[in-house]
A protein has these predicted regions:
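Acidic-aromatic/histidine active-site loop/patch
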Residues: 230
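Short, hydrophobic alpha-helical segments
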Residues: 234-241
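Generic structural marker for isolated residues within well-ordered, non-membrane alpha-helices
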Residues: 49, 198, 214
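FAD-binding beta-loop-beta segment adjacent to the flavin cofactor pocket
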Residues: 188-211
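Short pre-catalytic strand/loop immediately N-terminal to key active-site residues, enriched for Gly-Thr
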Residues: 213-219
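Class I S-adenosyl-L-methionine
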Residues: 1-183, 189-191
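A helicase ATPase "motif cassette" and its flanking acidic/Ser/Thr-rich regulatory loops
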Residues: 226
Length: 241
């Protein structure tokens, strides 16, 4: 369904899992009509959104994780109880960045050249804003591809303590971050998000995923939920006594 993907919708095997979810839910309802359910999915075309909503019998609530974290992560949430948007916690990207990062997370010159190369219409990965920077409000949306490095995992970090957030956008314009400025800028580091920073962007406790390789941590976090959003939804679930 994702606008960032191939948009195969229900023809994608992963999206077709929705019908497995629906079959399981309907089976449980036949035993327990009062069962509570919740479903999350990406931003999608209205025609697909309507199919899911009609089959579930409820309308979704659209929530951006940016309200509770430093990440722009726009998702639809369906549940068979009423719930409101979470309050804005005003978390900045700088709040999630680690101070001392191992050099292995720094991008190589080869990686930066990959970001510079023309992709479509003479534009490059910088122009498409496949990166986050500490002077913006929020980070881009982390995905399962974050482990690949460029162009999915590029953050411009600063030695000085700037308080700001980064953004998740896909439109053009380098603005003040034209990379030619950075080459002589001592204070600027072009690197990957660390797994711990990704945990913070998903409001997961530090080192919660450190029992597996970094590659698996990135995939796990990119495919996961923003914990504080889910907590907000579940906190509003009515408890029958």
């Amino acid at each position: 369904f994702s606008f960032a993907g191939k948009q195969l919708a229900f023809d994608d095997p992963r999206s077709a899992l929705f019908f497995e979810y629906l079959n399981i839910l309907n089976h449980i309802k036949s035993v327990n009509p009062n069962v509570k359910f919740m479903l999350e999915n990406v931003k999608m075309k209205k025609e697909y959104l309507d199919v899911i909503s009609n089959l579930l019998g409820v309308q979704p609530v659209f929530i951006n994780s940016a309200l509770v974290s430093a990440q722009n992560r726009q998702r639809y949430y369906w549940a068979n109880w009423e719930f409101c948007q979470p309050e804005d916690k005003e978390v900045m990207l700088i709040d999630c960045l680690e101070d001392d990062v191992d050099e292995k997370f720094l991008h190589t010159q080869k990686a930066l050249e990959y970001m510079d190369r023309a992709v479509k219409g003479g534009r490059n990965h910088w122009d498409f804003k496949h990166h986050s920077d500490a002077r913006s409000d929020k980070s881009q949306c982390i995905t399962a591809n974050t482990f690949k490095g460029v162009p999915y995992n590029v953050v411009i970090a600063f030695k000085e303590n700037l308080r700001a957030k980064s953004k998740c956008v896909r439109s053009g314009g380098r603005g003040s971050f034209d990379r030619h400025e950075w080459d002589s800028a001592d204070k600027i580091h072009v690197r990957k998000f660390t797994p711990t920073e990704c945990e913070r962007l998903q409001t997961v406790p530090d080192n919660y995923t450190n029992h597996v390789s970094n590659t698996q941590r990135y995939k796990m976090l990119g495919n996961g939920w923003t914990c504080d959003v889910i907590a907000c939804i579940f906190e509003q679930m009515p408890i029958e006594k």
